[in-house]
Amino acid sequence: MCNQMFIIRYSEIGLKGEKSRRQMENILIQNIKSELERYNIFPEFKKSDGRIYIFTDSKLLYDILPRIFGIKSFSHAEEFKFRTIEEIVSITVSKFSGMISGKKFAVSAKRSGSHSFTSMDIEKILGDALYKYSAGVDLEHPDIRIYIEIRDNRFYLFTEKIEGPGGLPLKSEGKLLSLFSGGIDSPVATYMVMKRGSATDLLFCSLAHPVDTVQMLMAAKNLLDKYSIGYNAKIFIIDGSKLVTAISEHPDQMYTNIIFKKLLYEYAEYLCEKYGYNGMVTGESIGQVSSQTPQNLMLISEGIKYPVYRPLIGFDKEETINYSKSKSLFMNQSSAEFCSLFSKNPGIIVNHKDFYNEIKKFNVKDYMQELVEIDKNTIDDYIKSIKNKRFRGELDNVEFIDLRSGSDYENWHEPGAINLNLGELRNFIEHADRFKNYVFYCKKGLNSAYAASIMSKHGFNAYYVSERDLKSMQKN
């Protein structure tokens, strides 16, 4: 009689002292249990000599275990009891004689406990017993590699080792707050600190609610459902639209991108203090955009009391994209960065004194206010509650507002559209007709989404669309 089960292996946990290792093993087991319980799977768990054994035959574990941090590899195995080496040989031959017919094989053995034989003895004895059923032995590139692990009076047979994500168990290394945009960089940065065992919550500053909020939540759901196993991560959503309005009306546009980032850091600092986070995480890398030069990163971080962790600091964009794809984090959705709402010619080298003279004009609590706090388990419900204002081409009594540059407007615009910049939006709203449907469009859709969200807050029927999507509607 045998038991169907899974063998879990770890690497770094085994390097810890006895107390830390025991704690991390227990956290890892609890994380696995919490995910299995979602599917009504309640198996028995055992620990022994650097292994965790899960007694279940559920194929769901093939999907779940590769996403749980702390697991180096795992195998679906069968457990047998034995008294003599002859019993091991008999059971192994009965299991694999048919499987290796016409194929080359190899045997890899490991042993723990007090026995009259060594691991090499087992490999030789089993190899000799199986040889006549096979096409021969190939130790380097066998068609089938038979693994046997012997622990005291039990042994385990399996034919594959499946890689896990490695790292440390989630919740074993403190708690961090990720500045999360939902683009390419922030999910990867968040994944990397989660892999190191840090339970990580997300902070998102919405500039065009609900549009950019929905896009962010889709990226957050993809990340958290896959990898935040054992931890129900929080998501803080704050409204930064007042800041966009203030900055778009500001006479000096050189510092606007950096002002935004500095204020976001200050709000994150406030949450770190309020909820006991050990630091904040960003997806910044040196020189990627104007606000991420070493000089500007220093300015943004200056005076912040909590550590700022930047896992991608040395990555280029292609490396980040490739990493994102390898972890199934890459989402092929069109989303512009916040900087497209601000300066077209941002400052690359910023004067320290001038910057602080500018930042004094902006109080973070005046311009960033919390919209909502949700968690991983309520993302779907919150998305359903948000009314999406994307224009789909089926409206009467429509007025189009072009938010692109004057030169782009002259080259092409929707017939009858008026050309406007965000700094003129407040005045436009004061004189708008409440019986019309207003459709804003811009290059990528974020400026227009922001304008539509502001106008909707004033009680108007306002929608947004990107230039590309609007042109596509015309062709159809």
State where each predicted segment sits.
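RNA-binding accessory domains that recognize and position tRNA/RNA substrates
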Residues: 1-177, 187-232, 382-385, 442-444
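Mid-to-C-terminal catalytic subdomains of enzymes
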Residues: 40-44, 277-292, 301-303, 313-358
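Short amphipathic alpha-helix with an adjacent loop that forms part of the alpha/beta core around
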Residues: 94-98, 246, 391-394, 425-434
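Flexible, polar/low-complexity N-terminal or interdomain linker segments that lie immediately upstream
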Residues: 110-112, 362-411
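Active-site adenylate/phosphate-handling loop in enzymes that bind or generate adenylated species
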Residues: 125-130, 161, 166-173, 227, ...
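Hydrophobic/small residue at the entry helix of a nucleotide-binding pocket
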Residues: 184-185, 447
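A conserved beta-strand->alpha-helix junction
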Residues: 221-250, 337
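Rhodanese-like catalytic fold shared by cysteine-dependent sulfurtransferases
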Residues: 406-437, 444-476
